[in-house]
Amino acid sequence: MNPSAAVIFCLILLGLSGTQGIPLARTVRCNCIHIDDGPVRMRAIGKLEIIPASLSCPRVEIIATMKKNDEQRCLNPESKTIKNLMKAFSQKRSKRAP
């Protein structure tokens, strides 16, 4: 093999190995694909999880797990109903804490 061809071949291999770990596009990964704006009864919620905005997902996510069937519903944090629900949930929680 020609020495200059071997050098070019090695440079190409080095260039390819350097680009292997670089992502082509940044993907946004949020937990909630569909956001529910419908009413939710506080008694029906078993667990309420608030996930703040981060680098992987630019929006705040509120995930409610229902008591009856463990169904998870993504709630709209901008909805007036959900804001009232969050306020009631935090008041209920603060009353329980000693």
UniProtKB/Swiss-Prot annotation:
Citrulline modifications at: 26
Tissue spec. comment: Expressed in the spleen, thymus, lymph nodes and liver. Expressed in astrocytes, microglia, and neurons.
Principal subcellular localization: secreted
Consequence of gene loss (knockout): CXCL10-deficient mice possess a significantly reduced or delayed infiltration of NK and HSV-1-specific CD8+ T cells into herpes virus-infected tissue. In consequence, the antiviral response is delayed.
Name of protein: C-X-C motif chemokine 10
GO biological process: adenylate cyclase-activating G protein-coupled receptor signaling pathway; antiviral innate immune response; cellular response to interleukin-17; cellular response to lipopolysaccharide; cellular response to virus; chemokine-mediated signaling pathway; chemotaxis; defense response to virus
Molecular function per GO: chemoattractant activity; chemokine activity; CXCR3 chemokine receptor binding; heparin binding
Quaternary data: Monomer, dimer, and tetramer. Interacts with CXCR3 (via N-terminus).
Purpose of the protein: Pro-inflammatory cytokine that is involved in a wide variety of processes such as chemotaxis, differentiation, and activation of peripheral immune cells, regulation of cell growth, apoptosis and modulation of angiostatic effects. Plays thereby an important role during viral infections by stimulating the activation and migration of immune cells to the infected sites.
SUPFAM superfamilies: Interleukin 8-like chemokines
Signal sequence, renumbered to the chain: 1-21
Keywords: Chemotaxis, Citrullination, Cytokine, Disulfide bond, Inflammatory response, Secreted, Signal
Taxon lineage: Eukaryota, Metazoa, Chordata, Craniata, Vertebrata
CDD domains linked: Chemokine_CXC
Family matches, as PANTHER family: C-X-C MOTIF CHEMOKINE 10 (PTHR12015:SF188), SMALL INDUCIBLE CYTOKINE A (PTHR12015)
One Gene Ontology term, aspect cellular component: extracellular space
Cystine bridges: 30-57, 32-74
Gene: Cxcl10
Cross-referenced InterPro entries: Chemokine_b/g/d, Chemokine_CXC, Chemokine_CXC_CS, Chemokine_IL8-like_dom, CXC_Chemokine_domain, Interleukin_8-like_sf
Induction: By interferon gamma.
Sequence similarity: Belongs to the intercrine alpha (chemokine CxC) family.
Subcellular location: Secreted
